[in-house]
Amino acid sequence: SNQDEYDINLILAPGIINSVHTAVASKIIDVCEDREDCFAIIDPVIYGKNVGDATEQAETRDSNFAAMYWPWIKVPDSQIGTQRWVPPSVAVSGIYAFNDKVAHEWFAPAGLNRGTIDTAIQAERKLTNSDRDTLYDSSVNPIATFPGQGVTIFGQKTLQKKSSALDRVNVRRL
């Protein structure tokens, strides 16, 4: 975690699921908190879970150096010519990179302008307004499907429990 040796601003480990690999997810967040110059994207649950399972995992964390997103998304796999379900962190990291390139870190990597996941074929679950509210209130950023808009990141909260400016991804990443 030496800042002088490693220049990083984002840490993720697709497939390292908070509900299954709790110690590894904790270590990733610890590194970000120790360095204070990077941010973690943590996948809350394995494929096939529900809103309650995802929010339960967010409740196990309290950090403004990490965020969770849900549900999983289906993307094309050009190497084998099929489609595959991937953890949210796979697509979310691409949205962070896109956002940083076109708008900089101080803008939210979310919403219809900067949060639409162009490579997504579909989200694992079509979230209702109630689902989105439940997730967001629990600090899980919803990945929603909007007619004519596609699959979109629709939240930018960190895992911090206390309300403050640092409970927003764009503020924490400044």
Protein language model features and the residues they cover:
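A glycine- and small-residue-enriched flexible loop/hinge signal that marks low-structured segments
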Residues: 1-174
